[in-house]
């Protein structure tokens, strides 16, 4: 008896199992679709060209080509995310798409961090065998990495200068210079996220007026703690507690006073606008509300991107120190290890303010309670966050 579930699809599968392979008349083949001939044959070992082949040069080329392909994918995802953000109102139904693509960037960066140990299977002596062929080539000349940084939100004024402007390494390459200029002039992901945060529901002074309530609760909390500290019988403990409370007042002053906030921005110690900081704090404190759940995850993704970028920079720095030490110049003329180490500073973190939000958190019992109107607003699946007046 014939199997009732047997279909033509299974019959065709039997032909394939017997060795009958579909021809190109059915469409593009695997290698054609992926253009593997161009990719697989794009490794040109300079040591081979010089008739002194060095085995590990092949690994070096493959790894860096893989980096560049992943950089291209990150830029592709970044551009699509920026397009979704770059509107007068952000369609909240697309937040899941933004989250998915941000998570994809995070996973790619995690993979890139794991590439470093593969390169480290090459010893410093192995690297020395072909390092001379690299000059004046340098990772500093990676156009895509510079575009990636610019599109994320690394500002030119925050970059570490090693001996020239970062654009200068591209010389007379007009196309590359135009792409760099465009990436600097266009709104970065950091810029667009700030605009989005500035429109967070609940910041309206004519509505919930979160920030005024938050300010009042913070100072009431500090006043109570100060009164309690003054009752401490032991002088050294009392003085320590009062000093700590004063420091906390000073820190909170920087988020409640716009001039104090702008002073930190001018020094590069804070990146977000005054209103964007308010939105980020609001989302963080009320992250359990349905409407703020995905925005809170989005903010976490931005921190994850910064974290993995920093981990990648750190692993890269340690690998460079291991390969060439801390005194030699890089192949492109940079200070090598010294320059790379300087890029680990907070000035390269585009979401620095999100990392520092925990400084301003208060106990749940002191978080301003939602009004009925605000509670309804945060439990409603609204499609767009409309800009406030």
UniProtKB/Swiss-Prot annotation:
Its EC number is 1.13.11.11. Keywords: Dioxygenase, Heme, Iron, Metal-binding, Oxidoreductase, Tryptophan catabolism. GO terms for biological process: L-tryptophan catabolic process to acetyl-CoA; L-tryptophan catabolic process to kynurenine; ommochrome biosynthetic process. One of its GO terms (molecular function) is tryptophan 2,3-dioxygenase activity. Binds 1 heme group per subunit. It holds the Pfam family Trp_dioxygenase. The keyword Metal-binding applies. The keyword Metal-binding applies. Belongs to the tryptophan 2,3-dioxygenase family. This is Tryptophan 2,3-dioxygenase.
